[in-house]
Amino acid sequence: MKAFAWDEQKNELLKDNRGITFEEVVYHINHGDLLAKLDHPNSVRYPHQQIFVIKVEEYVYVVPFVEDKERYFLKTIIPSRKSTREFLKERKGDYEIG
C-alpha cells in the first residue's frame, strides 16, 4: 500500500476538536477497518478527491484524500451518522445502523 501523509496542524486540530487523529485512521485502514474507497460525491468542487470510509469502534468516519503515485494525502476526518447507518447493519434499540 502507498504511504500516507497529512498536515500536522490539521491533525492537531482534529485531535482537539474531534478526538481522532490521522494516525488512528491509518491504523484502522491497515487493520482491516476500511469499509470502502469512494469517489468524492461533490466531484465538481473536489475533482481530484476520493473518500476512505473507515470503521472506528462502532462508528464510521469518512476521510477525504488526494492520491498520487507515491501516497495518499489525507485532508480531514468527518464522523458520519449517515455512513454509520449505511455501512453497519446492526439493530440498536429502535434505530437501525446500516
Segments from the language model and where they lie:
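Ribonuclease/tRNase effector modules and their secretory precursors
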Residues: 1-98
